[in-house]
Regions:
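Serine-esterase "nucleophile elbow" of acetyl-processing enzymes
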Residues: 245-284, 303-305
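Surface-exposed, low-complexity/disordered Ser/Thr/Gly/Pro/Asn-rich loops and linkers
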Residues: 69-119
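Surface-exposed binding patches on compact interaction domains or structured appendages
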Residues: 1-3
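Extracellular carbohydrate-recognition regions
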Residues: 38-71
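Extended extracellular/luminal ectodomain segments enriched in beta-structured repeat modules
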Residues: 105, 114-126, 136, 197
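A short beta-strand micro-motif common to beta-rich folds, especially ectodomain repeats
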Residues: 11-23
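Terminal, low-complexity interaction segments
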Residues: 149, 160-244
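Alpha-helical cap/lid subdomain in secreted, periplasmic
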Residues: 303-367
């Protein structure tokens, strides 16, 4: 197999390779053409049956997941130095790309070929991540800037098992079925250095030896796949926001269900706000069909609430709940809202809580 580095130019390129027998009596010449790069941003990954031909075999055979729409970005997995000799086990299960035998130091790598990324550019990284019981629990989002891997220190959390383990997001250990909880990853980063005729690189690196189930990682373990969930979730979306300096920064909490993740309104909100001069640091948890009351019992929802410091919170109730909260006969709906709002304000006393009424109707009109 003949491989080539990503073409960072806007024009196609070609090369000629000659194969010759050791005695020189026979030879063959092969021309290799490589298409011009597409635009690096935005790059978007949605994993479903209709896009499977774009990534299925390239992932399992070649360790490449090209963007399914948008631009020229691609995802791969890379071993850390301690595990360099061990092979990954890559698969596609119900359209989701998965990798087993990932352990501490290994990482998901996002690569974006660029002709020029200006110094001071802000790149917005969004992803949905999942892990099985014996997969790595903690990951840190890092970006390669001037040859150095950096993280956004202000957004790092501390693992309760060991304060030396700092992370950006964690996986739940339940990737499928009714009990799943996925990690919603939203990280904005500013590149101090320009990238010219090269690649913008962002990675999600496993940190700490802990599994989602609370054990110690083992590279030969089963039930240990890390994966990127299929549609309705969007796997990833990465955009270049440009070099502007926003007028202000607000921290925003988003909790909701499928109405909050099918079309990625939180990711779009972040981009729209930036264009209007506002930076949003959004933390979120989304799970399908959940009511506000059910969010109170979801570990990932309570974790993100307890991070605190929010200026705004958007709470999106389950669409089949009547939405006349203040006067509806279905008292449990009002109770769920007020209890969740009180929990938000306990960690963020000055937070403005905003209720999203998915569909507005009374209980008399239910169904």
């Amino acid at each position: 197999k003949i491989g080539a580095d990503a073409n960072t130019k806007t024009a196609p390129r070609s090369a000629v390779v000659t194969f010759a027998s050791t005695d020189g009596s026979k030879s063959a010449t092969v021309r290799v053409d490589q298409q011009a790069r597409g635009e690096a941003f935005p790059s978007k990954w949605v994993f479903q049956a209709s896009t499977l031909p774009l990534y299925g075999s390239s992932w399992t055979d070649d360790n490449v997941i090209p963007a399914t729409s948008g631009a020229a970005g691609f995802i791969s997995v890379v071993r850390g130095d301690a595990n360099a000799s061990a092979a990954f086990k890559r698969s596609v299960v119900t359209n989701r790309p998965a990798v087993s035998t990932m352990v501490e130091g290994d990482y998901w790598l996002y690569t974006f070929p660029v002709e020029n990324l200006a110094a001071g550019s802000v790149v917005d990284f969004n992803a949905t991540m999942a892990g099985e019981a014996n997969s790595p629990k903690y990951f840190i989002v890092e970006y390669l800037d001037g040859g150095v891997w950096k993280s956004v220190e202000a957004d790092l959390l501390t693992a309760p098992e060991n304060p030396a383990v700092r992370y950006t997001y964690k996986c739940s250990g339940t990737a499928t079925g009714s009990s799943y909880q996925h990690a919603t990853v939203m990280q904005t980063m500013r590149f101090e250095n320009a990238v010219t005729d090269g690649e913008v690189k962002i990675r999600c690196r496993a940190v700490g030896p802990y599994t989602c189930a609370g054990g110690t990682q083992n590279i030969t373990a089963t039930n240990a796949a890390s994966s990127i969930p299929p549609y309705g979730f969007t796997g990833s979306y990465v955009q270049n926001f440009g070099t502007a300096t926003p007028r202000d920064t607000k921290k925003v909490l988003c909790l909701g269900n499928s109405f909050s993740y099918y079309s990625n309104p939180a990711w779009m909100l972040k981009e729209i706000a930036w264009r209007e001069g506002h930076a949003l640091n959004i933390k979120a948890h989304f799970k399908g069909s959940q009511t506000l009351t059910q969010h109170l019992s979801l570990g990932f929802s309570t974790d993100v609430i307890e991070q605190g410091g929010y200026d705004f919170a958007f709470l999106q109730d389950q669409s089949q709940n009547p939405a006349n909260y203040g006067r509806d006969a279905t008292a449990s709906i009002l109770t769920g809202l007020t209890t969740l709002a009180d929990k938000v304000r306990a960690a963020s006393p000055s937070c403005k809580v905003i209720l999203e009424e998915t569909w507005t109707f009374s209980s008399a009109s239910y169904g």
